[in-house]
Amino acid sequence: MKLRDILALMYKIHKDSGISMPYLTGGVPRDKILGLIRDEISDLDITTGDASIHNLAKEFSISLGHQYSIDSKQMDDGHTSVYVGNLKIDFSSNFEVPSAEQILKKHGIKNPTDLQKEVFSRDFTCNTLLMTLDLKKIKDPTKQGFPDIKKKILKTCLDPDITLRYNPNRIIRVIYLASKLGFDVDPEIIEWVSKNKDFVRMSSEGYLAKNLDKALSKDPDRSVYLITKMNLWDTLPITDSLYPYYAKKSVIKGAQWRTNYDYGEGLYMNLDKYKSVSEFRRKRRKNRLKQLRKLKDMKLK
């Protein structure tokens, strides 16, 4: 079944059942703005911004199930995942942070709608964009999504103490998303995590390991830099992909070091002194050239 047919069915259910307007949110509109959508889309996030999302998920599963073999699962956090072939469709849990209305009023939104309360309760501003089901328009309800994507910075929608405290799974996603997208991380997030790192332990070790390995596969420099900046070396599980960097950081006796990690300068042991990943990479390139010149001089002698 083609994507447009799936979205057309979703729109029909919305019209016929009086369900609030559904939108694509999360990765698809974000990646569209970033120019990252090239292949077939395999993951959709859907929201209506209110409790009618649960009715949409149910009716969509029933309608599609009459024509295709599907698998529908109710997840622990309250969202519904529907699998159609290689496509996964996640229907929002409609999560709202406690006292969302009062918090938004303090931010100058006098009478926040259900959609605004749901969107501001999301993890990061880059994931709050809303795309219409005809794929023609993208809205920015927080007015923070477009600017932060343009600046390539990861920021929480509300204060990190609210956004991360109420869902600690989002902490490891800071590392994963920043590494995946090549984004810098808001210093307020880094400061909050470094002071509240015990919240990381509220996530399962399997969830942490999965996201950590995905992050390292995308951009190991950025991943290791953020782990160091947020002081998480003694909190995260040391997976096989993280171990070589942990060995460098901790100077584990007998560890098998790879000399091309720091080019003899111990860069990974002093990551906290760098202001950004870019500064670290410039220093590493400089050291690499320095090392190559030394080798060249030795050969000439």
Report each predicted region and the residues it spans.
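Catalytic cores of the polymerase beta-like nucleotidyltransferase superfamily
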Residues: 1-301
